[in-house]
Amino acid sequence: ASLSMSVVASSATVVVAANMKPAMEEIYQQYKSATGQEFRIIYGASGNLTRQIQQGAPFNLFVSADENFPLALSKEGFTVDEGKVYAIGRLAMIANKGKGIKLSLKDDDLRKIITSANKIALAKPDVAPYGKAAVEFLTKMGLINLAKDKFAYGENISSATNFVVVGAAPIGFTAYSLAISKEVARDADHLLIPENLHEPIRQRMVLIKNPPQSVVDFYNYLQSPQAKAIIKAHGYAVP
């Protein structure tokens, strides 16, 4: 038993907001083949990952979908510092291709789309920043009251997106990065939501206290031109 304990203790863990999965998988593969370093990577909703860190989970680096969660952890003394903004995310509306929905931001069209949808998929707004952005967008468009009784919540942005991909919900909201990924684009059309229709999705990452050097190196690599190029290719702006 003592042996397996030490193995667990030495394996560094990076926790990542679910919207970053396609980009992070690509960055990690590149990093692993360049350095031979391996980590455990766990994907989830930013708020859920934050709660686990507050409860003492042995995570070393938190790559969030927003700034609020990492800055709260920093204030509470869980992190090395306030971390760095590594990406600016974009929100997208998606529709299952089999449902014959033509996505549009024109007031009348959008109202019709929301009215005719029996379910609207989004990630839980209290734990998932992209779910929060979706609520802000619908509020700004004056459609929140029409929409809110139809919300089908995913535990994180991946599961919310999947509702639309499999047709359990005709429409939903996701990260633009996931909307353009091959797995999603095959089964769902997307519409990029203009940035001025929700609060900016500034994504911040923070090192949790006493990180192993291997994780500090990876954190620095995430700010490198190579990593930034991948993040950009996945539909984010980089600071």
Where are each of the predicted segments found?
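Bacterial N-terminal signal peptides
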Residues: 1-6
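Exported/periplasmic ABC-transporter solute-binding proteins
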Residues: 7-34, 40-43, 47, 51-57, ...
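Short active-site segment of divalent metal-dependent hydrolases/proteases
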Residues: 63
